[in-house]
């Protein structure tokens, strides 16, 4: 196939590794196959775009991916059934832009995934789609499209199920809009019928298959995980480091430059292809290529892209945990923190992380990726973490967060005082920030903020 060349790539992503290792076989959460759409900080399922940790549902933007890499058996080559103990090599997905030598990280170890009995019917069957519609309606029943679909639920579900089974179902058009908090980004919204199908596909097949084999400290967008989980794990790592090495240590913190905008479609599809059977993979690629044309980049808005977001960097997690043996490592989407005893180890980790990201088509964000002393504190997921001389891990709200809150609440209070907004809306917004601050060691800050908030209404 034009644009696809065979090239052996090493399973070990550490330069100079003495032996190749299959780093995808470990399963930290073997029983964590529960369905989920999007999780808030506590890990509970939530359809509300405003209530999850990213302030938006998943993602969108891009280009049509190149063909996914196949196994030797799929290509009809001899030796596909060999019992040779050496790990199976993968084809390399390379388009015209890859001629310069950019390597694909698409390695599919082991046999091709197979459908479980009843799995396909559990995705496109009537009962599965009906349950998916009932889950998707939460928080959006005020929309005409949702109300119309639910009013004719049985008829619409039966029609969709038949189209999916005979191959005539087509995804609808998407709609783009911008959000400004917590940072400016473009969101892609899909129609309610498409959401019903995609949720059934993701919840009943893609999500449970993809999370199988994740390391425990891949913390984003999974059941029983989330921002609260990631923060508590980081605090535990700081205490563990103190018990072994005292208060002195070094932090290797990385951030991927433009994670979703720079995500290559062939890499995202290859991550899915390693774990999804061909029937499910065909539906997944149809959705992704319809919603995200091009070859590079996604924008938030799709549940499937959020799953891709937590899956694409799985090789990085296994390199850190399994190959390098870094126990004190946590990753939340594209932000990762590793705590190490010496500066030399932290710098080696930074170099290895950068090399691995490069093979996946990413680069480190030079402003946010750095090696620094543990005593300086760690900024992670909206809080500043500090380790005391007695080994206690403290978590404080970032000062910039407090400043933004006061500016926003002050503006809302003025609108309420002029009759342009209900005070209950202002109270709700302040209470939301207060709940966020209460997750940290913020007793004094909350007491001062409460006094400040009461004073707003006396002006």
Describe the role of every protein-language-model region:
Residues 2-70:
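C-terminal, surface-exposed recognition/capping segments
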Residues 67-158:
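Non-catalytic, polymerase-adjacent accessory regions of viral genome-replication enzymes
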Residues 69-93, 97-103, 190-191, 195, ...:
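Right-hand nucleic-acid polymerase module
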Residues 116-119, 202-261:
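Active-site-proximal segment of RNA-dependent polymerases
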Residues 163, 167, 232-333, 337-354, ...:
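Conserved polymerase palm-domain catalytic core
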Residues 173:
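Extended, charge-enriched "interface" segments that sit outside catalytic cores
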Residues 184-215, 295-321:
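Conserved pre-motif C helix in the palm subdomain of viral-like polymerases
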């Amino acid at each position: 196939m034009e644009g696809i060349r065979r090239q052996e790539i090493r399973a070990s992503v550490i330069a100079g590794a003495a032996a190749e290792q299959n780093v995808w076989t470990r399963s930290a959460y073997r029983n964590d196959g529960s369905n989920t759409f999007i999780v808030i900080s506590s890990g509970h399922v939530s359809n509300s775009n405003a209530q999850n940790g990213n302030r938006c549902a998943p993602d969108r933007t891009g280009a049509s991916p190149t063909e996914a890499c196949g196994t030797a058996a799929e290509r009809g080559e001899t030796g596909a059934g060999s019992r040779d103990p050496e790990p199976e090599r993968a084809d390399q997905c390379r388009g015209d832009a890859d001629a310069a030598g950019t390597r694909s990280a698409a390695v599919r170890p082991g046999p091709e995934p197979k459908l479980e009995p009843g799995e396909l019917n559990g995705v496109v069957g009537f009962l599965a789609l009906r349950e998916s519609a009932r889950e998707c309606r939460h928080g959006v029943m005020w929309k005409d499209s949702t109300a119309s679909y639910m009013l004719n639920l049985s008829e619409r579900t039966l029609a969709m199920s038949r189209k999916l089974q005979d191959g005539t179902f087509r995804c609808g058009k998407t709609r783009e809009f911008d959000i400004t908090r917590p940072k400016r980004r473009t969101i892609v919204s899909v129609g309610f019928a498409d959401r019903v199908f995609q949720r059934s596909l993701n919840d009943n097949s893609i999500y449970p298959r993809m999370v199988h084999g994740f390391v425990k400290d891949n913390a984003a967008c999974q059941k029983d995980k989330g921002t609260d989980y990631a923060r508590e794990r980081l605090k535990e790592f700081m205490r563990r480091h103190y018990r072994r090495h005292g208060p002195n240590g070094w932090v290797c913190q990385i951030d991927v430059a433009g994670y979703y905008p720079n995500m290559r479609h062939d890499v995202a599809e290859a991550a899915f292809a390693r774990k999804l059977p061909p029937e499910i993979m065909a539906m997944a690629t149809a959705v992704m290529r319809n919603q995200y044309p091009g070859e590079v980049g996604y924008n938030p808005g799709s549940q499937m892209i959020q799953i891709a977001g937590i899956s694409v960097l799985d090789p990085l997690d296994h390199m850190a945990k399994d190959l390098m043996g870094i126990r004190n490592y946590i990753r939340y989407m594209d932000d990762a923190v590793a705590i190490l005893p010496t500066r030399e180890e932290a710098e080696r980790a930074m170099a290895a992380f950068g090399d691995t990201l490069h093979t996946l088509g990413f680069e480190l964000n030079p402003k946010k990726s750095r090696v620094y002393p543990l005593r300086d504190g760690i900024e992670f997921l909206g809080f500043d973490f500090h380790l005391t001389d007695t080994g206690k891990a403290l978590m404080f709200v970032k000062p910039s967060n407090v400043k933004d809150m006061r500016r926003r609440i002050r503006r809302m209070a003025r609108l309420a005082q002029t009759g342009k907004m209900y005070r209950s809306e202002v109270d709700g917004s302040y209470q939301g920030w207060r709940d966020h601050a209460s997750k940290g060691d913020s007793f004094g800050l909350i007491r001062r903020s409460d006094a400040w908030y009461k004073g707003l209404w006396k002006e």
